[in-house]
Amino acid sequence: ASDVYKRQNGALLAKKISKELDLISDKNIIFCSMKINKSNPTENIQLSIDINECKNQSVVIVDDVLNSGKTLAYAVKHFLDIEIESIKTAVLVNRSHKKFPISADFKGINLSSSLQNHVDVVFMKDKIEAFLF
């Protein structure tokens, strides 16, 4: 896989959230990973399931860090091609540098930082840590 597809922290976070929801909800939770080329987000977006499985369903799009909003905006746009019940967005770290008109419905933490800062999210067996540098 090319460098633009390697990081899958959003999928790891979504998997953890879907497992937790399975424990507390009687709803049928379907996990789906999505691959978006960050340098060319209009290029072939890949889903791990057929998009039609999401038809007339509620969709939650999960990412680890919301920076400019570009990735999340293109992820939401992808699901607008089918009829769905609702779309919500969830992020672990919400930064305030958005260039796109998108926001997270569910946020782990709001982080004010400069554009020069970088947030790295590390997934371990028992915990998830976010580092600002």
Give each language-model segment a name.
Residues 13-15, 71-72, 99-101:
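Short glycine-/acidic-enriched loop or helix-start segments at secondary-structure transitions
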Residues 1-5:
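Short, small-residue-biased leader/transition segments that mark boundaries at the very start
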Residues 7-13:
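Glycine-rich phosphate-binding loops at beta-strand->alpha-helix junctions
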Residues 57-86:
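Internal catalytic or translocation cores that form aromatic/hydrophobic pockets or channels
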Residues 6, 36, 92-94:
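Cofactor-binding loop segments of dinucleotide-utilizing enzymes, especially the Rossmann-like FAD-
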Residues 77-133:
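PRPP-dependent phosphoribosyltransferase catalytic core
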Residues 10, 49, 61-62:
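Structured catalytic core of nucleotide-sugar glycosyltransferases
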Residues 15, 19-58, 70:
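Short, glycine/charge-rich flexible loops or terminal/linker lids adjacent to PRPP-binding catalytic cores
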